[in-house]
């Protein structure tokens, strides 16, 4: 493991010190290579499963002369990557001097193609959404970003989509993290491809966002597919339509790397940020192995943190050290858990640590305030 002697001395001397592995950060940002398993969903087209009451719902209170950002707000469009309202992202891009609009259709997680499939099948709407975003923020140009590694998929992607240049991103997973500095230097703003499609529909068809694009996949269903579904659909309803197996042992909603396990399929509904629903037959055991200190989790962290020490500090409840080790910078990609030979739940423990650190800091602040009042 890395030598901490100088850093610990700095800490004991009362200095604030960052424990990120800057010497290894470039290596870490290369990411890890994952099997994609995007077929047959990616090449199978998009199936539409919508409730009658949520199909083509008109935008409330739409006024003649509303600008693009206002329409995005009234349409309730949510960016599928960030979970934030699209109008806020557009407004921020407009105020920051954005020069380039980027349509994110990366889909770098295994099984998931719920951004790429709409980008390929609904290219006209995507391009229209890109042009609207450019107009809204005053950008000069635009491009789309698509993951280079598509595994065994027969889908071919040209140099442009409807005239918009395509940048094939070749970094490992998580690919988006490797692009942050590049986007910052270019003054580029990134928007989810699906959000841009919904923007085109809102402006041209005057309809609100009531649907989301989702990939249903895994060996626990008869076939995988990309869907456009209304936001009132449950995970169980969608999985059963595609042959949910009785042997399914685990269902994950979100993504294969960043998703969360769910148990109540019929009460878990899709949201505007749901990217996939995966059903797996594999039996996931809690082996309770002991960490062997190999450091593989540190090697792959895309933001240069030390999952090894963060995991140890969470287990020990050492909250002050969690802050010193920049736990708040964790992006939740799950690569640390993926490479762990002991099958430890490193990523989920770090997520728990982030939440407990907030509670710890709030309690500490409240205690200090009470002491000041008594003084």
Positions of predicted regions on the chain:
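Short alpha-helical segments in extracytoplasmic peptidoglycan/chitin-binding modules
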Residues: 1, 26, 232, 237-241, ...
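Acidic low-complexity segments
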Residues: 32-93, 112
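Hydrophobic alpha-helical positions that pack around
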Residues: 50, 65, 75-82, 90-95, ...
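Residues forming the flavin
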Residues: 24-41, 158-162
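Ferredoxin-type iron-sulfur electron-transfer modules in oxidoreductases and energy-metabolism complexes
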Residues: 277-288, 298, 302-375
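N-terminal, Lys/Arg-enriched amphipathic/low-complexity engagement segments
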Residues: 2-27, 32
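Flexible, glycine/charged-enriched surface loops at secondary-structure junctions
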Residues: 139-145, 211, 246-254, 321-324, ...
